[in-house]
Structure formats: C-alpha cells, structure tokens
C-alpha cells in the first residue's frame, strides 16, 4: 500500500473531522504590554512634581546664602576700610556689628603700618589696598581663626601641671633623711637568670671582645662608670656626692657582673653624725642587709659562684666609708675624721681608741689609715656589747687590757685585747707605742688570740711578721658560723715606730682590727656567730663565708654601743651608724675588691668585715696612693677570678705588695690555640647549581700567588694561621688608609718624574747618536 491510498482511506473514514489540524505559523501576542508613548502614569507625575519642588527649594536656599555672604562681604569691606583707618588712629575698633574682629596676622599688620610710615605720601587708595591685601589673607580664615584661637588658650594650662624640680636638700635634711632611712630594709632584687642558648665559639669570642672594649672605655672614663655603678640609697648617695667621695662609693657595686646589685650606698649618707651625739642604729633591724642566700640567716648572698656578696642590703653608710674615702685622707673610721689625712702625722693616724694618739698605733676602731676600722660591731674596737665603754674605746691602745685585757703576745702595750668578756669584740689595739700588737716582730710567727668565749672561736690571728709584706690572710671560716678567724696580717706595714714606714698612708702601725666575733660578744645576738671581724688588715681578707651570720646579726646591741673609736680625735664619737654591718666607720664592702692596694680579698663575703676598710689605706707599703681610676678598675675586675677560692671558703689574698689595680680588667684571655684558627670550609660554599659548572681548570692558585708574590712581595699564606681575633686588630683605620694613599701618591709622582727624566735622557742620547752617525757619513 502506498502512501497515497492510505491518505485517501483516512480521509474517507467517518469519525474524522473535516478540518485538518495544522500548526499555526502566526506570531502570538507579546508577553509585555507595549509602552504607550506620551502617557505618564499618576505615580510618575507625582514623582516629577516632588523633584521640581526640591530643586526650587534648593535654589531659594542658595540664593539666601549668597545674599548673606554678599552682605557679609560688603560689611567686611567697610569694616576693613574702617579698621585700616582705625589702626592708624590706634583706636580699638570693634566691628560695626559689635563682634570684635580677630587681628590674627600681627606681623603682617606691623609690616603694613611700617609701609605706611615709609610711604606717607602714598595715595590713600593704595594704603587701603595694602590693608585689604593684608586682610584678604585673613578673611577666609577669620572664622577659623576665631575657633582656632580658643584651643591654644587651653593648651597652656596643662603645661604648668609639670612640677618644678624639687629643690636640692640641704645638709640637715639629708641627715634627717638618712636617720629615717637607716632602719628601712632594702629590697634585694635577685637577678633572674634565664637559660641562654649555648653559644658558638665565634659568638663567645665576639662577646669577650665587646666586653673588653667596654671595660677599656670604662677605664678611660671612670666617671661614667661610677654613674652606672652607683646604686645607692637615695640620701646616702647625695650626701656622698656632696662630700666628693662618690668616686669611692660607686665602686662598691663593682661586682655587678655577678648579677647581684650591691648597694653601695655611701656610708656617708647614713653616717649621720650629729657632731657629738651617737646614734645607735640597730643593725639587726636591717634584715635585708643580713639577707643571705646562703641559708645562714645572716649570710650575705652567695652568688652562684659561691662568692658571698654582701648584697645591696649593705647599709649605705658602710660601704662608702670604707672605700669612699679618697686615698689621701683616711677619714678615721667612718665619719669622724673625714677630713683628716691618714698619713698626716703618725700620731693622728695612729689615733688609739683610747684617744692616746701616741705614735702610729692606730687603735682598731680609729683606723688611722682608714682601713683599720673595726668592722661592724667591733666598730671602734669598742667591745661590742655594752662593754664598749669600759675597754672599748677607753682602753688605751697600749693598755693591756683595760677590757678583759689579756694582752696576748705583746706585752701589755702590744695588744690590749680583752678577750674574755667582750669575747668577740676583742679589740686588738695596737699599742700606741708602736709595738706591734702581737709583737712577734721578727719571728713573724703569728700569735693566735683565742677570744675567750667559747662560741666565738674567732681568733684573730695576727701575723705580725714584720717583714713579711705578704702575710697571707687566711681566713677560713671554719664552720662558717663561729670560727671566722680574722687573720690580721700586720705585714711589714705594721712597723710600730715609723708612722710613715709601714702603711702607705703613713700611719705607722698597721691597724689592729678587732676581729670581733659576733657571737661571743655580749651585745651580739647569738646568731651572730659570724664574726663581724673587719678584715681591714693590709690585705683585706674577705672573711670566709663563715662569718656570714655576723652580717645580719651584726650586733644589734652593739649597735648602740659601738662608737667608732676614731671618734676621740674629733672629740665626740661620731655616731656613724656604726652598727651597720659596716660599723658605720668601717665600710663593709663585700667585695673587698675595691681595695686597690690590698690584695683583693676575694670579693669577700665582705659583709661582716669592712673589707679594705680604707680602700686607699691599705696600699702596699711602697705603692703610691690609689687613684680613682685604679679603684674603679680594681673594684670591678676581680670578680670572676677568685671564684675557686670562695668555693672552698678560703680567701686567698695576694701579697700586700701586689696591686691588683694594674691588672687588665676582664677574664684572662684564653691563649690563642689552634681551635681559634680559621678554617676554610669548602662545604659552606657548596652550591648545588654549580654541580654542572664546567671548570676548565685555569691556572692553579699556587701559580697565581707565585706571580703575585714576585710582583708585589705579598705572601697570601702569611696570615693563614692567625685567629680572627688577632686579625681584627690589624684592620687599618680610615686615617691610616688615607696616610697610605698620600704616601703612595707621593711615591707615584716621584716615579713619574724619574720616568720623565729617563725619557729625556734617552732622547738626548739618541739625538747625539744621530749627530754622530751623520758626521760619520759625511
């Protein structure tokens, strides 16, 4: 069946409608209503109406503004003219509307008036113009200026808020302040030691180098150094600077490297001495001073290396007096004699406590040389307890013992040291007569005095070997508490007879320093087993840790009693707050390091003992007086070195003749060994990108350096074995380079001239040869 017949059949079927269905090709109506042009809907018309109104309103506002501005401008113009005229008549013209017009640009105005004076003849119009010009600048700003002017007026008010510097205290105020401060505990700030990463050898070398550099700078500029070092109680410090002793007191903090800050409060500050009256300071009250890390209640802090350092707690008085006193004058112990030159006359320095100034013997307390000051309680050699009066100062130096008076070795005159009762306070007085107290002069054997009381085994061993300059002060603090024995070395210095002979200061005899053990002393708290013995002898020995306790315990009672015996000379016992650990007069400088002349007691745990009581006093006999610089250096240097000695509790003292001050500061340089040598590390230069670099060999280095050596005479292996450290010092400075350049320039010019001369000679020679040749040819 073909398609045609099928269609026919379908059409013929009765069920089918007659209309064939087709897809309409007509386009349907649009989905959106078409816009009708020219017709505004009501909403649109309302919107347009609103817009028109707004624009009209804006215009009116602008018009009004414009009118206001024009009116203002007109007014200002008139004002300006009127003001220009008014300024000529010096009227105070307030604007027409009553608002004063700010005349800000004063300078401009002045220049305008000057112009007026210069050109009196100028036309008025011109003058107005100048005024207008003047004003034109300020007109636009005039309103701003009025607003700006107000704030400046407010600004000045805060400025007065700064308080004017407080007026300097006068001396009496300082004394009062010192009295008040001496009982206040001082906080000791323990340095926080944080773990540092291990450093490479290179870094260590660098640090060492920088340290040395800084120390050199300090040596050159001691004053700056002192300022850094001075951590003094406020008042003490001011006072000390008044006295001019500051150089000394700054010293005490020398061991700052160890990290504990020693308060070098100048003893002067606290040594408030009201002419005659004696103030008793209660040492015991100063817990801080006693504060000691060692665990013994009073032991001064022991820094890591075992060095007792009398931490800052030291009462201000103590430290300064000890070393604060300029070498020239030993202020006898403590304040009493500040002005008195030690060396002065043997007698003066020898002032015996008893007041017998005879000869050079210096009673313990009055350290003629300043170093003799008895330490802490024994302060003036006065027995610490109440006895001080009886045998303390009263005891004539020579007197064997008005005290308990057992003259141990030296016939009565020698040492009248009452051992028994005062026990620790035994003031060993050197007899005024000059006999050496233990007086075994030639033998040099030491007489050992045991102080009677059991607890205090402080025996002051006085090595009187007359000749032995180096009597070594060995102070082992036995148990640490009781037995600190102060070995006093009378050293050669103790030559009784010659006031000048022994001590550099010229006080003839060495000082007897009472080695008072604090414990036995009646006045002393039991705890004070540590001896407060001043180690003032020729080499201040820092007492071993043992006496640590004495520090704090430093006799409270004694405090009252202790009067520096030096007092007698002045007539009133100066009341240095002697009870201070430093026993006012004696300064306890824990580091004896500062003592220049004497062997430095190894940083002594100084607390109890005035180390080096007179910093200058103890110079080795022959040495010149110590200078500020030397003291500064000596005080700072030795900290690191004596560590070993401290650990064992043994203080090693250098012989008195030896001046530590001369040693260069800083830890000793390690020898330059092969470990320092520079190494050429090829690995450091390795670069992975260079692996495929083709090296065609080139000339070998030795070949090249051989030529260089021939031409310039330079050997490149010359410094191969030098350390970086050494090479650092070979670098030339800019000035040296310039000199070198000038020199080479001179040489270059010279060589050029010689070259020119040679060339001229060559030319002449050639000319001659030519002439000769011509003649020959003819």
Curated annotation (Swiss-Prot):
What ranges does the record give for the region Disordered, renumbered to this chain? 1-21, 50-625, 639-685
Q: Where is the composition biased (Pro residues)?
A: 153-167, 662-671
Task: List where Gly residues composition bias occurs.
Answer: 336-357, 365-384, 395-417
The highest taxon in the source lineage is Eukaryota
Q: Name one GO molecular function term.
A: DNA binding
Residue ranges, annotated region (Important for interaction with histones): 666-778
Chief subcellular location equals nucleus
Localization in the cell = Nucleus, Nucleolus
- Ranges annotated as biased composition (Acidic residues): 114-135
Coiled coil where?
44-83, 193-221, 735-778
Ranges where the record places region Important for interaction with DNA = 1-665
Polar residues compositional bias, start-end: 242-269, 588-604
Q: Name one GO cellular component term.
A: nucleolus
The UniProt keywords, alphabetically, are: Coiled coil, DNA-binding, Nucleus, Transcription, Transcription regulation
For bias type Low complexity, the affected ranges are 312-335, 385-394, 418-493, 506-559
Q: Where is the composition biased (Basic and acidic residues)?
A: 50-78, 190-227, 270-286
The record's annotation in InterPro entries points to: Chromatin_SPT2, SPT2_N
**Swiss-Prot/TrEMBL GO biological process terms:** heterochromatin formation; nucleosome assembly; regulation of DNA-templated transcription
UniProt lists the family membership as follows:
Belongs to the SPT2 family.
The family database entries (PANTHER family) matched by this protein are listed as: PROTEIN SPT2 HOMOLOG, YEAST SPT2-RELATED
Domain-related comment: The acidic C-terminal domain mediates interaction with histone H3/H4 complexes.
Quaternary structure (record) = Interacts with histones. Interacts with a heterotetrameric complex formed by histone H3 and H4, especially when the histone tetramer is not bound to DNA.
The role this protein plays is:
Histone chaperone that stabilizes pre-existing histone tetramers and regulates replication-independent histone exchange on chromatin. Required for normal chromatin refolding in the coding region of transcribed genes, and for the suppression of spurious transcription. Binds DNA and histones and promotes nucleosome assembly (in vitro). Facilitates formation of tetrameric histone complexes containing histone H3 and H4. Modulates RNA polymerase 1-mediated transcription. Binds DNA, with a preference for branched DNA species, such as Y-form DNA and Holliday junction DNA.
Protein name, UniProt field: Protein SPT2 homolog
